[in-house]
Amino acid sequence: MDNSILAGKYIYSLMVENEELSVLVDSDKIYPLRVELRLDPDTGEEQEITFPFIIYSMTSLEPTYTKNFLTENLLKYTVIVVSDDYDNSLEVANAVRHALEGKAIRNEYLNICPIKLDSVTEETMEDTILQRMEFSFAVN
């Protein structure tokens, strides 16, 4: 059975377990797909979202088949570093790169081949800086 769709759990683990990145971004500020609003346990009010934070998502999964069976999947992930400070956004993006690039995972569920950084682009939205990083890897 193929478990490629579970790769996001391992992407998250690689980021939260990286010491360089954990100094810059708390593990509860690394989000799959979107930022999760949190409520203050005492007041029940929404807590303010603070910078920096990271959003990651799978952008594609392309299976490769032969006549007989599935041989591997090529997965692409986008990791977006969000900050209100340009230098900080660069430091966090660099730490994300160190956490993911070249890493491979082999266990009973998945065989993730070394992760490759495909591209990085910068953009702004109002007073917010985004470092958009595209990663790809094969799972077989």
Where would I find each of the regions flagged by the language model?
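Hydrophobic aliphatic residue packing
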Residues: 54-55, 79, 92-96
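A generic structural micro-feature
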Residues: 46-50, 69-73, 111, 125-131
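Oligomerization/assembly interface segments of phage tail-like spikes and tubes
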Residues: 70-85, 129-140
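Residues in well-ordered beta-strands of folded domains
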Residues: 31-33, 55-57, 80, 118, ...
